[in-house]
Amino acid sequence: MFEGPVQDLIDELGKLPGIGPKSAQRIAFHLLSVEPPDIDRLTAVLNKVRDGVTFCAVCGNVSDEERCRICGDARRDASLICVVEEPKDVQAVERTREFRGRYHVLGGALDPLSGIGPDQLRIRELLNRIGERVDGVEVAEVIIATDPNTEGEATATYLVRMLRDIPGLTVTRIASGLPMGGDLEFADELTLGRALAGRRAMA
C-alpha cells in the first residue's frame, strides 16, 4: 500500500473495467512520470467527456448532441433497426459497412443474478420507437444483435417474445457464425458482416 494521493490514484484506476491492481499501479506510476502538460491534456479530455458527452435521446448511443450522428442522418434506412447491448457494439457493426439502418442500444443485457431485468434496459423505448414510427417511417425489421453468450441469448429470446406479434414487423437474429460466449465488439468485420447478412427470421 502506498500513501496519500498515489494510493488514491491507484484505487480509482483499479475501478476501471479490465484493470487489476498491478495494472492500476503501473498506469499510476506512468502518469507520475509524464510531463505536466500531458496530464493537463488528459484532465481536459476527461472533463470534456464528462460535460459534453451524453446518450442519444432516440437510440441510446453515445453522442455530443441530443441526437447522435446516425439518427440524424436522413440517408440511413429508418425502417431497419439493429438492437445491440452497448454503444461499443454500434461501432463494431459500423466497421462492417454492411448495415445502413439505425440502431437501438439497450444499455446492457438481461442478467437476473446481477439484478438486471427488462425494466433496467431500454426495451420500453424500443417498443415506443416501433409504435410511434421512426421519423414517420414504419419500422419493417428489427435485427437482434445481442452478444452470443448466456445473457445475450436470454435477452434475444425475451425481445422476440415481445416483438413477434407486432403486425407487419419482421424480427431477425444475426447468424450464429460468432463464437459462443464472445462479445460483438471483438468480432472481426468479415465475420460480423457475414452474421448480419445471414440473419435468420425468428418465429
Swiss-Prot record:
One of its GO terms (molecular function) is zinc ion binding. Residues 79-179 form the Toprim domain. PROSITE patterns: RECR (PS01300), TOPRIM (PS50880). The keyword Transferase does not apply. May play a role in DNA repair. It seems to be involved in an RecBC-independent recombinational process of DNA repair. It may act with RecF and RecO. Belongs to the RecR family. PANTHER family: RECOMBINATION PROTEIN RECR. This is Recombination protein RecR. It comes from Mycolicibacterium vanbaalenii (strain DSM 7251 / JCM 13017 / BCRC 16820 / KCTC 9966 / NRRL B-24157 / PYR-1) (Mycobacterium vanbaalenii). The lineage of its organism: Bacteria, Bacillati, Actinomycetota, Actinomycetes, Mycobacteriales.
